[in-house]
Amino acid sequence: MDIKDENIIEITTELSSEFEVAKELRKYPKDTVIIKNVKGYDLPIISGICNTREKIAKSINCEVSEITQKIIEASDNPIKVDKFTDFSDYNTTEANLDKIPILTHYKRDGGKYITAGVVFARDPETGIQNASIHRMLVLDDKRLVIRIVPRNLYTYFQKAQKLGKDLEIAIAIGMDPAILLASTTSIPIDYNEMDVANAFKNGELTLIKCGDLEVPQADIILEGKISVSETSAEGPFVDLTDTYDIIRDQPIINLSKMHIKKDNPHYHGILSAGFEHKLLQGLPQEPRIFKSVKNAVPTVENVVLTEGGCCWLHAAISINKQTEGDGKNAIMAALSAHPSLKHAVVVDTDVDVFDPQDIEYAIATRVKGDRDLMIVPNVRGSSLDPVAESDGTTTKIGLDATKSLKTLDKFERVSFGE
């Protein structure tokens, strides 16, 4: 795993993978942490490799303010991977999850959860490969239950069900942050996320031939099949809102092989509801929102799903306002692009969308409630929103915190130009 972080915190105290490691990780919300002594296991644990925008930007060689454009560029111009290797650098055995220090995070969790596992599968009809992160609950040493939401892998699974044939998969854990980021991107179903990763890597990405799949050189790779006939209860699990998600009946994964790197392997555990969880789930939605807003307001500068909004429910959008009404058009475009978005605030380019205090300043000095507040009741929202109705509907709010073009001189920020 290639980690570009000079400030790694190493914990040498012996800790249990049940609750104790997670408790320790919560002390370091924005640090990269290695737990070197996990009770009963040989493998150390690493966490926090993607828990700040700065780390993510560094992994794809750009500034924080350029992340959205970098993702758009790589997604629109993927580079087909043409470099491959094998498992000669790995120890290959029969699958045995008891050898991996998989974490139990919180008291009411359904059990031990793999949280940084990227699942690779091929469309049973077209053969196109997909990569996506999924939480997976451990049932025993060879079985997992996977939470599958209605996206690409779900489509593949439905096709496999119709064919009556279990879906072959590989699960990669512990990889280059740029590859991990690529696996979270929202791209068309006929695109391959590893080609996006290859664009991040300037065409230099090497993958492993794993049966019919092509997977990154992760520290741990599991092989198996998603059963089209077996299910089990999945949950509870603490989701990015720091609240428990519900228990659902989900498909079972039956594992066959396990490959662990010979040279210094780590188990990557993402702390549920931590910043790494929030950023990897939310940040890749920002390009989609940006594109939608750009269609309505071509002078959009940036879009941020804020940490206070769990990187999912709240967006801050900066625009170079040209006409009255641009702010509200940006709000409507953002809400339609990301259905889970609950509150959106639009600001001018003299406001730093990465700074919560600056956003609050814009709200305090530029918003007139009866004019600038939009309320949209009875619309579909996020299943993760604790106040959403049982049918998934909620009320959404947009706040136009841009300057009125009629009285620009009143809003000049003296310190901004100094």
From Swiss-Prot:
Reactions listed under catalytic activity: (2E)-3-methyl-5-phosphooxypent-2-enoate + H(+) = isopentenyl phosphate + CO2
- List residues traversing the bilayer: none
User: A GO term (biological process) for this protein?
Assistant: isoprenoid biosynthetic process
Q: Which GO terms of the molecular function aspect are on file?
A: carboxy-lyase activity; metal ion binding
Q: Which pathway does it take part in?
A: Isoprenoid biosynthesis; isopentenyl diphosphate biosynthesis via mevalonate pathway
Name the source's superkingdom.
Archaea
Q: Which UniProt keywords apply?
A: Decarboxylase, Flavoprotein, FMN, Isoprene biosynthesis, Lyase, Manganese, Metal-binding
Protein residues bound to Mn(2+) = 130, 193
Q: What are its E.C. numbers? A: 4.1.1.126
InterPro entries listed in its UniProt record? UbiD, UbiD-like_C, UbiD-like_N, UbiD_Rift_dom
Disulphide bonds annotated for this chain are: none
A Pfam family reported for this protein in Swiss-Prot or TrEMBL:
UbiD_C
One of the record's GO cellular component terms: cytoplasm
So which cofactors does this thing need?
A: prenylated FMN; Mn(2+)
List the active-site residues.
239 (proton acceptor)
Entry-linked PANTHER family: 3-OCTAPRENYL-4-HYDROXYBENZOATE CARBOXY-LYASE-RELATED, 4-HYDROXYBENZOATE DECARBOXYLASE
| Family in the record | Belongs to the UbiD family.
The protein's role, per its UniProt record? Catalyzes the conversion of trans-anhydromevalonate 5-phosphate (tAHMP) into isopentenyl phosphate. Involved in the archaeal mevalonate (MVA) pathway, which provides fundamental precursors for isoprenoid biosynthesis, such as isopentenyl diphosphate (IPP) and dimethylallyl diphosphate (DMAPP).
Name of the protein in its database record: Anhydromevalonate phosphate decarboxylase
